[in-house]
């Protein structure tokens, strides 16, 4: 299974692509989409850059599923609203590309990748490097996106074990595997 992770941001959005075969994770690609091509106050222009960039990444790498970080509400409500719009452009591009979309919080991703939810960005970068056997540290946005893909790989494996263990979860497991529920 090929998983595309997206770490949304209005200025810089990270993406990471990971192949999963059983318990084996393989790095495919990662990078960032920068909206600096649009004027600072041109929100619609920035959102279009994100939409087009995510659409291009999805077409190039042909993932089976995508995962996006859930926006947290921070101290500045205006920043939260802007980030939410950037995230919306990313999710819309994924759905337009006919991809099922899973969502995880930063805390869930950090816990899955590092082992605890309060991990620093540098810890996420290092663990992503180790888990994917990369020669160097990925950038922070790309590392978060790769971390989201790794998180979904782990969640998918856990759901598979759960689905096999109990007959009550077989229908839910099938829905999860098809991307209709999460």
UniProtKB/Swiss-Prot annotation:
It is found in: Cytoplasm. PROSITE patterns: RUVC (PS01321). One of its GO terms (molecular function) is crossover junction DNA endonuclease activity. Pfam families: RuvC (PF02075). It catalyses: Endonucleolytic cleavage at a junction such as a reciprocal single-stranded crossover between two homologous DNA duplexes (Holliday junction). The RuvA-RuvB-RuvC complex processes Holliday junction (HJ) DNA during genetic recombination and DNA repair. Endonuclease that resolves HJ intermediates. Cleaves cruciform DNA by making single-stranded nicks across the HJ at symmetrical positions within the homologous arms, yielding a 5'-phosphate and a 3'-hydroxyl group; requires a central core of homology in the junction. The consensus cleavage sequence is 5'-(A/T)TT(C/G)-3'. Cleavage occurs on the 3'-side of the TT dinucleotide at the point of strand exchange. This is Crossover junction endodeoxyribonuclease RuvC.
């Amino acid at each position: 299974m090929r998983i595309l992770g997206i770490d949304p941001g209005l200025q810089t959005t990270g993406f990471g692509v990971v192949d999963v075969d059983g318990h084996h994770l393989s790095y495919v690609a990662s990078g960032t989409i920068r909206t600096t091509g649009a004027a600072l106050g041109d929100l619609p222009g920035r959102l279009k850059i994100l939409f087009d960039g995510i659409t291009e990444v999805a077409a190039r790498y042909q993932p089976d599923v995508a995962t996006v970080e859930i926006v947290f509400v921070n101290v500045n409500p205006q920043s939260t609203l802007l980030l939410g719009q950037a995230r919306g452009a990313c999710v819309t591009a994924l759905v337009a590309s006919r991809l099922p979309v899973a969502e995880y919080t930063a805390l869930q991703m950090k816990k899955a990748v590092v082992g605890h939810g309060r991990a620093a960005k540098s810890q996420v970068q290092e663990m992503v490097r180790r888990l994917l056997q990369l020669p160097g540290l990925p950038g922070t946005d790309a590392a978060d996106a790769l971390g989201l893909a790794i998180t979904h790989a782990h969640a998918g494996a856990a759901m598979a074990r759960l689905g096999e263990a109990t007959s009550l979860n077989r229908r839910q497991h099938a829905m999860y595997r098809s991307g209709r529920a999460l």
